[in-house]
């Protein structure tokens, strides 16, 4: 089984080609293509309005020396720290929505694993993951580029992410 570090490296490669300075047309930033909501969850950012549109008009909180989106793009250590914090937060969301009840099941020939769930949540959030699971794959949301949750759940199924999830 692959390690957490391999999971992060492979996720970063899938999201941005591993480019810490990547910034896409939807406003997602860095190696892991994190948006405003992700950086709020990781404790790096506060949104002024209620709308999450990745316009970065909120306030950076200075965590790890990050005071702007440019600081974030120029700080690989902050991006790695933010991703670990965010993954732990996502795991909590997945637990809350009941996604862990599906661990070990097979949906559309794909084994449901902790790392697959985390990858699916990275792409579209825990709410979209539970829709996929509850409908046994009939509702399979995609991101703005057409990438499906199912493809992430499958691609990232074989990693040991117990440093994030703890013992299950």
Where are these regions (language model features)?
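Non-catalytic cell-wall polysaccharide-engagement segments
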Residues: 2-25, 37-168
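Active-site nucleophilic cysteine motif
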Residues: 29-35
């Amino acid at each position: 089984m692959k390690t957490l570090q391999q999971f992060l490296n492979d996720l970063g490669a899938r999201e941005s080609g591993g480019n810490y300075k990547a910034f896409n047309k939807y406003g997602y930033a860095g190696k892991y293509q994190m948006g405003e909501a992700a950086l709020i969850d990781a404790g790096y950012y506060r949104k002024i309005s209620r709308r999450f549109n990745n316009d970065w008009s909120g306030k950076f909180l200075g965590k790890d020396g990050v005071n702007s989106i440019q600081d974030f793009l120029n700080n690989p250590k902050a991006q790695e720290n933010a991703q670990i914090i965010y993954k732990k937060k996502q795991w909590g969301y997945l637990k809350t929505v009941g996604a862990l009840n599906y661990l070990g099941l097979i949906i559309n020939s794909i084994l449901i694993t902790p790392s697959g769930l985390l990858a699916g949540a990275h792409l579209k959030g825990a709410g979209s993951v539970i829709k996929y699971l509850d409908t046994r794959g009939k509702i399979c949301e995609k991101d703005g580029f057409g990438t499906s949750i199912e493809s992430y759940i499958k691609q990232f199924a074989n990693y040991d992410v117990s440093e994030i999830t703890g013992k299950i």
